[in-house]
A protein has these predicted regions:
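Transmembrane alpha-helix entry/boundary detector in multi-pass membrane proteins
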Residues: 1-10
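Aromatic-anchored segments of alpha-helical transmembrane domains
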Residues: 47-53
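Hydrophobic alpha-helical transmembrane segments of polytopic
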Residues: 10, 37-47, 93-103
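Juxtamembrane membrane-water interface segments of multi-pass membrane proteins
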Residues: 1, 14-42, 53-91, 106-124
Length: 124
């Protein structure tokens, strides 16, 4: 859980921020229409939270219980990872992944809109 959150939180969000910072410099005389960007921001962050809490955290908890009861080798075994309850938890990751993906698609749509003009509004 910590690795997924830290990797995306630090490098993914930092990369998105850097892209937006550079794009802001390309259009210094105009303001962005931030509604689409706000939706992208919230969908990406809520999707990451749902993915972590709804899927990755339960996997870690079940693996910890299995490791305490039967050893680390058992918690990392194919039999444990392919068990029915782990399959269900793996499918529970889909809602968070979809939110994250929709947020990223909105971000791409916003960036395309910067080039075509629909994501910009004239400076007042």
């Amino acid at each position: 859980v910590h690795g997924h959150a830290a990797l995306f939180g630090v490098y993914g969000i930092l990369g998105i921020g850097l892209i937006l910072f550079v794009l802001r410099g390309l259009y210094p005389d105009r303001h962005w229409n931030g509604k689409l960007l706000a939706w992208a921001f919230w969908l990406i962050n809520i999707g990451l939270l749902v993915m972590l809490v709804g899927s990755l955290l339960p996997v870690v908890i079940f693996q910890a219980i299995e490791a305490i009861q039967n050893g680390y080798w058992s918690a990392r075994s194919e039999a444990f990872m392919q068990s029915e309850h782990m399959q269900i938890i793996r499918w529970l990751r889909i809602p968070g992944d979809l939110l994250l993906a929709f947020g990223e698609l909105l971000l791409v749509y916003f960036i395309i809109g910067l080039q075509t003009g629909w994501s910009l509004k004239e400076k007042r």
